[in-house]
């Protein structure tokens, strides 16, 4: 098994606490409204805290797929949220799991900076595919921007 680590950062005009609430606390309701590809989010196991497993159903390339999302840590006081993709038909065969450690911090003019560390655990001696990595980054950036756009269009959401 190989472990490959990547870091990324995104900026947003949305305040950190409001963005965190949409991305974490109200994610099951907000994300399917904001992100066109995600059809639904349902809790498969758990109460929303660490250990909870959620099923995200999405449409990618015209196909309906799903991934299993396991919550690893929730730290509302420090605006941190860690989770892993642990299964589903949306996970490449060469990957055991993908872990995300996320944190929101104050950005310019009352906005946010989203920081993420991504750890990809591969099966056997498989290497992450560079094209898959670029595509995953593009999906992550589009996801973050979709949430920002939704919140900008819905100023009543607090």
From Swiss-Prot:
Please state what the protein is called: Class 10 plant pathogenesis-related protein 2A
For trans-zeatin 3, which residues are the binding ones?
Answer: 69, 81
Residues involved in trans-zeatin 2 binding: 60
Keyword presence, Transferase? no
User: Where Ca(2+) is bound, by residue?
Assistant: 32, 35, 38
Q: What does the UniProt record say this protein does?
A: Class II ribonuclease (RNase). Binds to cytokinins. Interacts with melatonin.
SUPFAM superfamilies recorded: Bet v1-like
InterPro entries, alphabetized: Bet_v_I/MLP (IPR000916), Bet_v_I_allergen (IPR024949), Plant_def-hormone_signal (IPR050279), START-like_dom_sf (IPR023393)
Report the GO molecular function annotations: abscisic acid binding; calcium ion binding; cytokinin binding; melatonin binding; protein phosphatase inhibitor activity; RNA nuclease activity; signaling receptor activity
Leader peptide range in chain numbering: none
Provide the E.C. number(s) assigned to this enzyme.
Answer: 3.1.27.-
Q: Which GO terms describe its biological process?
A: abscisic acid-activated signaling pathway; defense response
Please list the residues that bind trans-zeatin 1. Answer: 8, 83
Decide whether keyword Cell membrane is in the record: no
Where does this chain mainly localize? cytoplasm
Similarity field = Belongs to the BetVI family.
Q: Which UniProt keywords apply?
A: Allergen, Calcium, Cytoplasm, Hydrolase, Metal-binding, Nuclease, Pathogenesis-related protein, Plant defense
């Amino acid at each position: 098994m190989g472990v490959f680590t990547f870091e990324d950062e995104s900026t947003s005009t949305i305040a950190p606490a409001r963005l965190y609430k949409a991305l974490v606390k109200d994610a099951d309701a907000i994300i399917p409204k904001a992100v066109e590809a995600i059809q639904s989010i349902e809790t498969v196991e758990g109460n929303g805290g660490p250990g909870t497993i959620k099923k995200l159903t999405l449409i990618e390339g015209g196909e309906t797929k799903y991934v299993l999302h396991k919550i690893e840590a929730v730290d509302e006081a420090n605006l941190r949220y860690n989770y892993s993709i642990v299964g589903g038909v949306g996970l490449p065969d060469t990957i055991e799991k993908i872990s995300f450690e996320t944190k929101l911090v104050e950005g310019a003019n009352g906005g946010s900076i989203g920081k993420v560390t991504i750890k990809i655990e591969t099966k056997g001696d498989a290497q992450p595919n560079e094209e898959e990595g670029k595509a995953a980054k593009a999906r992550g950036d589009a996801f973050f921007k979709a949430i920002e756009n939704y919140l900008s269009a819905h100023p009543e959401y607090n």
